[in-house]
Design a protein with these regions (language model features):
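Short glycine-aspartate micro-motif
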Residues: 1-4, 125-129, 191
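N-terminal basic/disordered segments at the start of proteins
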Residues: 1-23
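Short, glycine/acidic-enriched loop or turn micro-motifs at the edges of active sites
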Residues: 7, 132, 196
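Helical "lid/coupling" subdomains associated with nucleotide-phosphate turnover
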Residues: 14-17, 33, 37-68, 76-90, ...
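N-terminal glycine-rich anion-binding loops that anchor highly charged ligand groups
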Residues: 21-36
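Dinucleotide-binding Rossmann-like beta1-alpha1 core, especially the glycine-rich loop
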Residues: 73
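A generic, well-ordered mixed alpha/beta core segment in the N-terminal half of proteins
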Residues: 124-138
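A short amphipathic beta-strand at an alpha->beta junction
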Residues: 479-487
């Protein structure tokens, strides 16, 4: 488990195992406000300390009851900077018998960046992690943190944004950001936004634009649109902000100032887009402890393999399925080959649902899977592919709302992938090892490609039948090429 003592909130996350993508079993936060008033007094809030100790009591009790082997306790800006921070740490260690790691600003920035790296393979840009007491900025490239900077721009330090202090707060924010000498390296790259306050802004944007997929991780907003939206938030009254269903009422008071910070980061850094990340410090703490070989594994593939092992009928052999359908998709780009591999992994995970609802259930579940390493369009691609695998149709009721997130070309590809999986799993009955003896190949002649042939000889010739014939006909029509069986 990881227990994160932040300036505004305390959160315990308990993970199952410690591999490349451990699954969260428990995730709860308490808004304690340890850093409330720190800028004026230099001390942790007395009320915040009382609330923190009460909630820590709960979290350590839960961790013990779950049999958690180790709880790593991390403390960030408020505890690091407060004059009585050492007293608080001593009180926690004495009462709960746990060592508290008070992270330096650089270490906090590094771990937050590693959390993003763990969730975004090949991430290239700048991580901005806004906590209650500070904003960490980290330049990441080639899965490494290159430069980092800590700035005192947490909302608890800045206070509330009003019409009267808008110019003063903007000057304070700009003064800190101008001290980040490499900030212009963000230009034209991605800004990865980490932290609960900024995730609240993402939720608000989703609600106001009627976005069809309520998944914060990898939600992206173009820089110009983000600046317009954030400016609107900074000028909206508290009453109207409280009317937003997607934003916690305890986050509303600080929403304008957190919007102003993000707006100035975008205006000064000039990224191409803002990408929101649900992975940060806690996940970076786990990722940092993995061997390098484990770190380099694909988080999407690993997560989906864990899901498949727990929910498939048979021991999953996605590599057999992937090899078998590969001739249909030889010309597909590498990024989509990776999604086809993932679709093969998930192709049987909804078998336990009622047959009338398998497609619907699989579609919704894939859209909402707690996995990373894919953007929202990728989620929709996988959801459609698995829907078609179960139903044979991409026009099922209830699936149209997310359609706009996927291009027509990719939707057509998802349809063909789903039909190919449907054929392969029908042919083998789900026991995909049988596909090893039903070879699929392209047919070519002197003129060029003629289509595909499935060679079934000996006892494997018995795999054919009416259902298989219908599946072949559907896929053949979608591909615009002949598929025939050779006995």
């Amino acid at each position: 488990g990881v227990l994160d003592i932040g300036s505004n909130s305390i959160r315990l996350v308990v993970f199952e195992g410690d591999g490349r993508m451990p699954i969260p079993l428990f995730n709860e936060k308490a808004l304690c406000g340890l850093g409330m008033g720190l800028q004026e007094t230099g001390h942790l809030s007395e009320q915040g300390v009382r609330s923190a100790m009460d909630n820590l009591e709960r979290y350590f009790t839960i961790a013990k009851g779950m049999g958690v082997s180790e709880v790593r306790v991390l403390a960030t800006a408020a505890v690091r900077d407060a004059r009585n921070g050492h007293e608080f740490v001593s009180a926690v260690e004495g009462r709960f018998g746990a060592r508290v790691m008070v992270l330096s600003g650089d270490e906090e920035a590094r771990l937050s960046a590693l959390g993003v790296v763990s969730a975004f393979p090949e991430a290239d840009g700048v991580v901005g992690d806004l906590g209650g007491g500070s904003l960490e900025l980290v330049d990441i490239q080639n899965n490494k943190a290159r430069r980092f900077e800590t700035t005192p721009l947490g909302p608890l330090r800045l206070g509330e944004l009003t019409r009267q202090n808008r110019d003063e707060l903007t000057d304070r924010i700009d003064s800190s950001l101008n001290g980040v000498l490499w900030l212009d390296s963000m230009s034209g790259r991605d800004l990865f936004s980490v932290g609960g306050a900024w995730r609240s802004l993402a939720r608000a944007h989703m609600e106001l634009t009627d976005y069809p997929l309520a998944v914060i991780h990898h939600y992206a907003i173009g820089a110009e649109e983000a600046v317009r939206f954030l400016d609107e938030i900074t000028r909206t009254g508290r009453k109207d902000l409280r009317a937003l269903d997607a934003v916690s009422k305890r986050r509303v008071e600080k929403l304008p100032v957190t919007a102003l910070v993000l707006k100035r980061v975008i205006e000064l850094g000039r990224p191409r887009q803002v990408v929101f990340s649900s992975f940060g410090l806690r996940e970076g703490c786990l990722y940092d402890r993995l061997p390098r070989g484990e770190q380099s594994r694909d988080p999407l593939v690993d997560s989906c393999m864990d899901i498949a092992r727990k929910s498939s009928r048979f021991s999953p052999h996605p590599e057999v399925l992937e090899r078998w359908i590969a001739p249909f998709f030889e010309d597909v780009p590498a990024a989509e080959q990776r999604l086809i591999r993932t679709a093969c992994i998930l192709s049987d995970f909804a078998w336990g649902e009622h047959p009338s609802y398998r497609g619907e259930h699989a579609f919704i579940r894939v859209l909402r899977l707690p996995v990373v390493g894919l953007n929202h369009a990728d989620r929709v691609f996988l959801a459609y592919a698995i829907l078609v695998r179960y139903t044979g149709s991409i026009e099922e009721e209830g699936t149209h709302r997310v359609r706009k997130l996927l291009s027509i070309r990719r939707r057509d590809l998802a349809y063909r992938v789903g039909l190919a999986l449907r054929l392969a799993l029908t042919l083998s009955g789900g026991a995909t090892e049988l596909l090893e003896s039903a070879r699929l190949e392209r047919e070519r002649d002197m003129v060029g490609e003629r289509g595909f042939v499935i060679s079934m000889h000996g006892h494997q010739g018995g795999l054919g039948g009416d259902v298989v014939t219908r599946r072949i006909a559907a896929l053949s029509e979608a591909l615009g090429q002949d598929i025939r069986i050779e006995h």
